[in-house]
């Protein structure tokens, strides 16, 4: 193999390791069995959430993970692997959530594992992460909780006002 090819591969691994280091959330899946249209739709959905998906040879994945300090992630790099990741701090659950949705829709998609903020996560932990709503969902839940006491107070005031109107008649 020529030195130029070896240098190009080493550069790719180094660049991918930097992407993995900066990633806030990483999910590794087995995607084999999806059609081209399904993979294209999957990538489009990931792009909308500021996430990326790369299909990389397992040897490169192991080397990049080692350089990124994710050595414990190496055991999941067996068989066909795609790495989904995001560096968006506001939406760290997106890769896990989208991968879990596709795993439910298509039996061929399998979540293998992942990492969150540099900590390796098991398949089960990634699935738990997928159950957490995104930032917008959490904010709407918080808003609902904050509005409840005010709304209940308004109902009580309205009921008191109505009862006084009825007693005045």
UniProtKB/Swiss-Prot annotation:
A cellular component annotation (GO) from this entry: large ribosomal subunit
GO BP, sorted A to Z: translation
Keywords noted in UniProt: Ribonucleoprotein, Ribosomal protein, RNA-binding, rRNA-binding
Domain of life: Bacteria
SUPFAM superfamilies on file: Ribosomal protein L10-like
Signal peptide, first to last residue: none
One annotated GO molecular function: structural constituent of ribosome
Cited PROSITE patterns: RIBOSOMAL_L10 (PS01109)
Family, similarity comment: Belongs to the universal ribosomal protein uL10 family.
Job of this protein: Forms part of the ribosomal stalk, playing a central role in the interaction of the ribosome with GTP-bound translation factors.
Subunit and interaction comment: Part of the ribosomal stalk of the 50S ribosomal subunit. The N-terminus interacts with L11 and the large rRNA to form the base of the stalk. The C-terminus forms an elongated spine to which L12 dimers bind in a sequential fashion forming a multimeric L10(L12)X complex.
Name this protein carries in UniProt: Large ribosomal subunit protein uL10
């Amino acid at each position: 193999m020529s030195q130029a090819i070896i240098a190009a591969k080493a550069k790719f691994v180094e660049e991918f390791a930097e992407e993995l280091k900066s990633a806030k959330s990483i999910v590794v899946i087995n995607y084999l069995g999806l059609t081209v249209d399904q993979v294209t739709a999957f990538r489009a959905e990931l792009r909308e959430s500021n996430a990326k998906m790369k299909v990389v040879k397992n040897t490169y994945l192991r080397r990049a993970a080692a350089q990124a300090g994710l050595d414990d992630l190496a055991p999941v790099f067996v068989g066909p692997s795609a790495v989904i990741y995001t560096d968006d701090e506001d939406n760290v659950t997106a890769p896990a959530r989208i991968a879990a949705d596709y795993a439910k829709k298509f039996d061929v998609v399998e979540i293998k594992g992942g990492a969150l903020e540099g900590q390796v996560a098991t398949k089960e932990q990634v699935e738990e992460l997928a159950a957490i709503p995104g930032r917008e969902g959490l904010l709407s839940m918080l808003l609902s909780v904050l509005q409840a006491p005010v709304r209940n107070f308004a109902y009580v005031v309205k009921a008191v006002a109505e009862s006084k109107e009825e007693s005045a008649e």
